[in-house]
């Protein structure tokens, strides 16, 4: 007996005008999550999800492509204005922000929410190249 083809449920369109874009730029990858004001995820994307592998994930171009993808998905739900929260030391911080602005979003505020330890965990050893 043949299996029934699975029905793919289409995402219902939420009419959310403003939200928060969380840009997490690590040394290895850049992740962009767009949420509503309460913190519920509307769309997300990352450099790895866009098909970049290895050291290419950490490039500014990969962050730009990921931000464009997350922005396009959020715009489908009617989002127009964004607050941007940037965290992490990675190279994709500025390019992700510029890509969101170029995608047609009005950026109302930019906040750096990078956590700084009050002398917490011991850091990684220094690289010797």
From Swiss-Prot:
GO cellular component: ribonucleoprotein complex; ribosome
One Gene Ontology MF term: rRNA binding
Matches recorded under InterPro entries: Ribosomal_uS11, Ribosomal_uS11_bac-type, Ribosomal_uS11_CS, Ribosomal_uS11_sf
Keyword Ribosomal protein: yes
Residues annotated as transmembrane: none
Keywords noted in UniProt: Ribonucleoprotein, Ribosomal protein, RNA-binding, rRNA-binding
Protein's UniProt keywords contain Iron-sulfur: no
PROSITE patterns on file: RIBOSOMAL_S11
Coiled-coil segments: none
One GO process term, biological-process aspect: translation
Top-level taxonomic group: Bacteria
Pfam families registered for this protein in UniProt: Ribosomal_S11 (PF00411)
Function: Located on the platform of the 30S subunit, it bridges several disparate RNA helices of the 16S rRNA. Forms part of the Shine-Dalgarno cleft in the 70S ribosome.
PANTHER family: 40S RIBOSOMAL PROTEIN S14/30S RIBOSOMAL PROTEIN S11
Subunit details: Part of the 30S ribosomal subunit. Interacts with proteins S7 and S18. Binds to IF-3.
NCBIfam families: PRK05309.1, uS11_bact
Assigned protein family: Belongs to the universal ribosomal protein uS11 family.
Protein name (record): Small ribosomal subunit protein uS11
Gene that this sequence comes from: rpsK
